[in-house]
């Protein structure tokens, strides 16, 4: 069965693919969006494909290496400037967060529900694994990451437990960490966990985001995408939690809306909008949620790059 990504139809509508255009899929994953773009491109069109995950790139090469319209590059979309010249793209798509294959394969170490090595790296050849990071850093740094990137209210309690645990034995497995977190979480008088989600959900999110520099890459990637889009080009971003969506929303607003001014201070320069918001944020409907429950937290935002000369007239 062909994988259909979250908010697929809305993403394709947002990109507004033209037959001879040039597009960038910055998060190839299983290739669902890439296939959708290629179905609409003619012989003169072009699709640039990127992904941090070498397994995703291997799939892209298996499926699309014989298609002359496709250029495949292993790496984060934060590096898209190395692949696309300024004002050369008609559309850019980022489908953020962890992919289904990464969650579903225990050996990748992303899931607290399946036992595997405590890795969490989207590119296993880059940087520290989650286990290496947890073994090295201070209690304070662990707590800060869980709080900042996982929005975990019990971050200090969990960090304290991790440091105490690692003093006696290493944390090397996903289920090992998940069970440790669950064992120290505050509970109600009846013994139930206070949260409706799994106790390790936010901690795993925070560690994963930190290990992969996800929010740093997102901020850099958005700026690079803006530079690479030609006037009229579309930016389409699908995010899966509030931290990602906040960055995307603020980025679009910063380049689309006149910033507030202080009437007591002189205006430094005239604001020139570079983006136009296209519609409101889009979420999955009930029909899609029945087929794909993981779509519940997805938010899609679309913006169009403006012609600077037109904008200042």
Curated annotation (Swiss-Prot):
Q: Does the keyword rRNA processing apply?
A: yes
Annotated EC: 2.1.1.199
Pfam families per the UniProt record, alphabetical: Methyltransf_5
Q: What is its main location?
A: cytoplasm
Name the enzyme group at the top EC level.
transferase
A Gene Ontology cellular component where this protein is annotated is: cytoplasm
Q: Where does S-adenosyl-L-methionine bind?
A: 31-33, 51, 77, 95, 102
What top-level branch of life does the organism fall under? Bacteria
Q: Where in the cell is it found?
A: Cytoplasm
GO molecular function terms noted in the UniProt entry = rRNA (cytosine-N4-)-methyltransferase activity
Q: What does this protein do?
A: Specifically methylates the N4 position of cytidine in position 1402 (C1402) of 16S rRNA.
* Similarity comment: family membership: Belongs to the methyltransferase superfamily. RsmH family.
The record's section on HAMAP family has: 16SrRNA_methyltr_H (MF_01007)
Q: Write down what this protein is called.
A: Ribosomal RNA small subunit methyltransferase H
């Amino acid at each position: 069965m062909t994988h259909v990504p979250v908010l697929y139809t809305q993403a394709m509508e947002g990109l507004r693919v033209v037959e001879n255009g040039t597009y960038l899929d910055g998060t190839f994953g299983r290739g669902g969006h890439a296939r959708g773009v290629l179905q609409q491109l003619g012989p003169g069109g072009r699709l640039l494909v990127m992904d941090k995950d070498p397994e995703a790139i291997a799939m892209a090469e298996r499926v699309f290496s014989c298609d002359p319209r496709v250029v495949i590059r292993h790496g984060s979309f934060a590096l898209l400037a190395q692949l696309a010249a300024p004002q050369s793209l008609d559309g850019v798509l980022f489908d953020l967060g962890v992919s289904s294959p990464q969650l579903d394969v225990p050996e990748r170490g992303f899931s607290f529900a399946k036992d595997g090595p405590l890795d969490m790296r989207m590119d296993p050849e880059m940087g520290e694994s989650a286990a290496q990071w947890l073994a090295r850093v201070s209690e304070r740094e662990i707590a800060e990451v869980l709080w900042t990137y996982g929005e975990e209210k019990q971050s200090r309690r969990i960090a304290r437990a991790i440091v105490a645990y690692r003093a006696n034995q290493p944390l090397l497995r996903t289920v090992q960490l998940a069970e440790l977190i669950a064992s120290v979480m505050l509970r109600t008088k009846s013994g139930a966990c206070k949260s409706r989600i799994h106790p390790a959900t936010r901690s795993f999110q925070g560690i994963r985001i930190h290990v992969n520099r996800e929010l740093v890459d997102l901020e850099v990637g958005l700026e690079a995408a803006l530079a690479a889009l030609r006037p009229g080009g579309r930016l389409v971003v699908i995010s899966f939690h509030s931290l990602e969506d906040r960055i995307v929303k603020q980025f679009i607003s910063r380049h689309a809306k006149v910033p507030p001014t202080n009437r007591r201070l002189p205006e430094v320069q005239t604001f020139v909008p570079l983006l136009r918001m296209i519609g409101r944020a889009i979420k999955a409907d009930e029909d899609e949620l029945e087929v794909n429950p993981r779509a519940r937290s997805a938010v899609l935002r679309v913006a169009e790059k403006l012609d600077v000369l037109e904008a200042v007239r």
